Amino acid sequence: MAGKTVTRADLTEAVYQRVGLSRTESAALVETVLSEICTCLASGETVKLSSFGSFVVRDKGKRVGRNPKTGVEVAIEPRRVMVFKPSNVLKARINGGAAEPDDE
């Protein structure tokens, strides 16, 4: 079920083909958007893209884990993780249906 992996170059080419910017301008646009998303996430902000989904940074507290091979308990330090929550529109599109756009 694995499909093609879309790269920055693929996104740049899609912008070039659909928007009509030069390849250089398309690459700059893609880099700017991705950079802004990264900057927002690094500062702890949620990035919400309507009809696509939300990127959310969550704090995970300190906890005790276990080495599966030895069974020895290991302390896992607190950390920040990023999660993606797809919108209902994206979920429906992936599953072949059409959903009404929402603000997720």
From Swiss-Prot:
Lipid biosynthesis as UniProt keyword: no
Entries under CDD domains matching the protein: IHF_A
Gene3D superfamilies: IHF-like DNA-binding proteins
This protein's UniProt keywords: DNA recombination, DNA-binding, Transcription, Transcription regulation, Translation regulation
SMART domains recorded: BHL
Keyword Iron-sulfur carried by entry: no
Molecular function GO labels: DNA binding; structural constituent of chromatin
InterPro entries per UniProt: Hist_DNA-bd, Histone-like_DNA-bd_CS, IHF-like_DNA-bd_dom_sf, IHF_alpha
A Pfam short name: Bac_DNA_binding
GO biological process: DNA recombination; positive regulation of metabolic process; regulation of DNA-templated transcription; regulation of translation
Membrane-traversing stretches: none
One Gene Ontology cellular component: cytosol
Matching PANTHER family: DNA-BINDING PROTEIN HU, INTEGRATION HOST FACTOR SUBUNIT ALPHA
Description of how the protein assembles with itself and partners: Heterodimer of an alpha and a beta chain.
Sequence similarity: Belongs to the bacterial histone-like protein family.
Primary role: This protein is one of the two subunits of integration host factor, a specific DNA-binding protein that functions in genetic recombination as well as in transcriptional and translational control.
Protein name: Integration host factor subunit alpha
Organism: Methylobacterium sp. (strain 4-46)
This protein's encoding gene: ihfA
